[in-house]
Amino acid sequence: MVLISETSDDGSTGGDHQIKKPKKEEDRNKKLKEKVQVSLPIPEELILRCFLLVRRCHHPSLSLVCRSFHSLMSKLYDDRLRLGYTENVLYAYVGFPPVENPSWYILHRKPYRNLPNTISLKLCKIDSLPPMPWGSTVVTIGSDIYVIGGRVGEKLLEDVGVGYNKPISGGRRGETSIRGGHAGERRISDVTHINCRFHEYRSLPSMKMARCRAAAGVIDGKIYVIGGRKVRTSDWVEVFDLKKQSWSSVPGPYPEAFGRGEFLTYAVMKEKIYCLDLTRNIHIYDPKESKWESWTHGPLSASWNDSSCVVDNLLFCINTSVYFLGWPIKIYDPEKKTWFYLQGLQGFPANGLFVDGYKMANFGGKLVILSADVHRLRRYDCRKREIWCIEIAWERKEDGTFWGKVESVAVVLTPAKTTSVDICGTVTV
């Protein structure tokens, strides 16, 4: 098991830790350490009750007050979960192709200058989490993120950048892919579990088959993984039991697969897994009934893209086809099998944010969109690179129409290099 905890820049691994401090400073630090180790006059139970009411964004500051507070932080998460004092936290996987590793980021939400009813948003890098293999499948469950499969190889390194040439856990199993790819590339069967409470990760049992760009969904406490390879074995669908921590195969028959059996995107609605393959055909799997349904055309396949999310069993998607005509978001109802427009949205940015990479996520019932934007400042190559965050609340009226309200629009990251938002997802901590 690999276990890595986040450390500060001035930790013991820094380059100056061998420099001897003056004796006066050592004595002062020793006295301060003895002082903070004294038992607090307030009972621990009472301190925990007070901490339960503190927003998670302030926990790092609290843990630095003294060692006693730091030790209480680990107990705090379980109590918050038990009492229902949880928060939604947005994680993003941001790439900097082709010169720098992609990295995990967390969206920090803090009161702006301690002013009431004001929130400052900022994407902060998480150094303790490793980059993912290209083509990995990602699902979130509670406070956990699961990274499944992917593809590695030297040719892939040249095509998409330095961050995608290694599996997270070292690549225990894989297969070389030549047809439909490049010699030297290989799919992997690795599975990694990320604990978002403490930003730690560990390896889980590998899948039976190596996969890349598979579809996945969580239903009844189990992770179903579909495709990511051609339909030619009995292991085209596998299921991971979270309690038993083991994989098993789901028997066929399977639907007719097109191309390499890989998928552009996927979603879970009404406890069914919807998959959009590379030729824009829809495959729907019902795990409870062990039934498949496939569409070769229709409204869903025509407008669905990988920048989408599901809220209340409805599929929300950026409407790229008519974005500049005032209808930036569409909603697909799986029961009525039709699309609706999200009306309202005064204040939605109209400066071409969605020309390049962007991702949408369900944030506690609201919509959050992260978009990498490049503004040309001059006639030549000088550009201002930004990642924007748009938060949207929405409701369904009695007449069946959908209305949205833009709650905030903010720049959350201004990197020095061109960026792309590869993944955007929410966990509960």
Swiss-Prot record:
Stored InterPro entries: F-box/kelch-repeat_ARATH (IPR050354), F-box_dom (IPR001810), Kelch-typ_b-propeller (IPR015915)
F-box domain residues: 37-84
Kelch repeat windows: 144-175, 176-221, 222-267, 269-313, 315-359
Compositionally biased intervals (Basic and acidic residues): 17-29
Disulfide bonds: none
UniProt-annotated stretches for the region Disordered: 1-32
Family matches, as Pfam families: F-box (PF00646), Kelch_FKB95 (PF25210)
Keywords on record: Kelch repeat, Repeat
Name of the featured protein: Putative F-box/kelch-repeat protein At2g21680
Organism encoding this protein: Arabidopsis thaliana (Mouse-ear cress)
